Amino acid sequence: MKITQVRLGRISTPLRVPFKTALRTVNSVEDVIVELHTDTGAVGYGEAPPTGVITGDTTGAILGAIQDHIAPALLGRDLDEFEDLTAAVQKALVHNTSAKAAVDMALWDLLGQKYSAPVYRMLGGARRNIVTDITISVNPPEEMARDARTAVQRGYDCLKVKVGIDPELDVARLAAVRQAVGRDIKLRIDANQAWNAKQAVRILNQMQEKGLDIEFVEQPVPAADLEGMQYVTRHADVPVLADESVFSPADALRIMQTGAADLVNIKLMKCGGITNALRIAAAAEVYGVECMIGCMLEAKISVNAAVELACAKKIITKIDLDGPVLCSEDHVLGGAVFDEKNITVSDAPGMGIQGFVPGKVSYLD
């Protein structure tokens, strides 16, 4: 099975409602599509969103990285060189993790098709069903309470609540959400780097003193402030999950070795795909650090790849893969089924992707 063409396109998917965090407001998912075509007729699919405020990637950067650097390293090569192919993706250029992730997942999709096995089985997985949380955007407290009630009515029993735009309002925001949903719903919060270390400890301890019962806080301080992360981890009465602080396997090791967080968030767009995500999961298994699998604002294909990993690794105990259910449309044929909080991975070879609704992808060729 030789790679004969790397085809690129763009796809736009409106969100049900605007997505608001401490970093940005987004109205639609804008993804780059990757198709790896082979001499057998098999096609491997990948996808990447430009998330400039986190990964630094833009649509043009993703397309350029793949066209000018990654594709030339793959064309004409056989999938039997799989380890060399995934290494070539990572070595083609520095950074550009979203572009690398899109191509890496497409290679895994092809590998599954080559051996007539779903990706999650090839990774050693046995479970087909996982349950995700859903994100509540940061807004005025009463609006967040309303959104939280709606999510619970849709069947969600775990909410990821965005905070951080105005730290002085964050306690009121979470209090409104907790009052709206009751005590049986899990609440995890994400500050998206918005606080400093002392501010984070003060706010988190206030939340706990009010009995708001937070499962964990995600990335309370700036990504580069590992000392600040350590301070929050040691002094706040809430477990800390490292997100933007962890891009590479080396980053994950540093977090685990220094005790800068209690948990680690794996995102394919940060680490460069399934291959590096497996390395992060392996390190977490050694250190006994539980992981969450998360996503950017992504549509179905790239989140599908994360689902394959989540179904394979028991160290991934927390699921934050709500991207497809935040979208108002599904342009992808086949693959995992996203039924509100319930996600079922496909048992078809590879990722089970069969293509796109006609006319939805704007190809570059």
Where are these regions (language model features)?
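Catalytic core of soluble alpha/beta enzymes
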Residues: 161, 167-302, 329-331, 336-338
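N-terminal small/glycine-rich loop or linker at the start of catalytic domains
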Residues: 113-137
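Conserved, mostly hydrophobic/aromatic
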Residues: 3, 34, 41, 70, ...
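Active-site beta->alpha loop and helix N-cap motifs at the rims of alpha/beta catalytic domains
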Residues: 136-144, 167, 171
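Glycine-rich phosphate/pyrophosphate-binding beta-alpha loops
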Residues: 48-56, 135-139, 295
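Flexible C-terminal active-site loop/helix
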Residues: 4-15, 29-31, 296-365
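Metal- or metallocofactor-binding catalytic centers and their adjacent structured scaffolds
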Residues: 5-7, 37-114
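Structured beta-strand/loop patches that form or line metal/cofactor-binding pockets in enzymes
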Residues: 1-40, 45-54, 327-329
